[in-house]
């Protein structure tokens, strides 16, 4: 991935984290990599564990970043979340949800989609 694109992705992820922290969520871990998938942000929201996918598109002609979270991507996120919970059994009993932070435009405008999809939808 080109350096400028990597920097943009890191900046959008940091902005998404700040947005969620302002809303009261607390970071558990960022950029957790597992075979077949990556979890951008894992956060606590009260008693719930939240797996957050951050998606950026400079141009939203074909839909914003959230439009790119198709069934294949959702399935990868669910698998990565299962692997995360297997590695962190103390968190496995918590209720979980999947959120998406959609970033589009220049400068990026963020939209938080709470409970964007459910694991059993995949």
From Swiss-Prot:
Against InterPro entries, the record matches this protein to:
Restrct_endonuc-II-like, tRNA_endonuc-like_dom_sf, UPF0102_YraN-like
GO-annotated molecular function: nucleic acid binding
Protein family according to the UniProt entry: Belongs to the UPF0102 family.
UniProt xrefs under HAMAP family: UPF0102 (MF_00048)
Organism equals Xanthomonas axonopodis pv. citri (strain 306)
State the protein's name.
UPF0102 protein XAC0764
């Amino acid at each position: 991935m080109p350096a400028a694109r990597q920097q943009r992705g890191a900046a959008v992820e940091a902005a998404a984290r700040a947005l969620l922290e302002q809303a009261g969520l607390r970071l558990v871990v960022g950029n957790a990599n597992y075979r077949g998938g990556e979890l951008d942000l894992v956060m606590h929201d009260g008693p719930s564990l939240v797996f957050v996918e951050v998606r950026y598109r400079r141009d939203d002609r074909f839909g914003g970043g959230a439009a790119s979270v198709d069934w294949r991507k959702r399935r990868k996120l669910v698998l990565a979340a299962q692997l995360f919970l297997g590695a962190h059994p103390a968190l496995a009993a918590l209720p979980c949800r999947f959120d998406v932070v959609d970033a589009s435009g220049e400068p990026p405008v963020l939209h938080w989609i709470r409970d964007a999809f459910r694991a059993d939808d995949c």
